[in-house]
Amino acid sequence: MKLSEVRKQLEEARKLSPVELEKLVREKKRELMELRFQASIGQLSQNHKIRDLKRQIARLLTVLNEKRRQNA
């Protein structure tokens, strides 16, 4: 993932409410589970997608924690 894409994703995530962020994290975790399943049965040809998705989840959780600290 390019740096400009990461920055754009962070900007969009920071605009979301904590509830929306939690929903997005759940969706990404479900997607990660599906990718891991595909990898385990040999259907996933692009293994880098798992790593990228894990990083996206981490970024979303970071933004979510930032918002929670601001409201505390």
Swiss-Prot record:
CDD domains: Ribosomal_L29_HIP (cd00427). PROSITE patterns: RIBOSOMAL_L29. Keywords: Ribonucleoprotein, Ribosomal protein. The keyword Ribonucleoprotein applies. One of its GO terms (biological process) is translation. It comes from the Bacteria. GO terms for cellular component: cytosolic large ribosomal subunit. The keyword Lyase does not apply. InterPro entries: Ribosomal_protein_uL29, Ribosomal_uL29, Ribosomal_uL29_CS, Ribosomal_uL29_sf. GO terms for molecular function: structural constituent of ribosome. HAMAP family: Ribosomal_uL29. One of the proteins that surrounds the polypeptide exit tunnel on the outside of the subunit. PANTHER family: 60S RIBOSOMAL PROTEIN L35/50S RIBOSOMAL PROTEIN L29, LARGE RIBOSOMAL SUBUNIT PROTEIN UL29C. Belongs to the universal ribosomal protein uL29 family. Part of the 50S ribosomal subunit. This is Large ribosomal subunit protein uL29. It comes from Thermus thermophilus (strain ATCC 27634 / DSM 579 / HB8). The gene is rpmC.
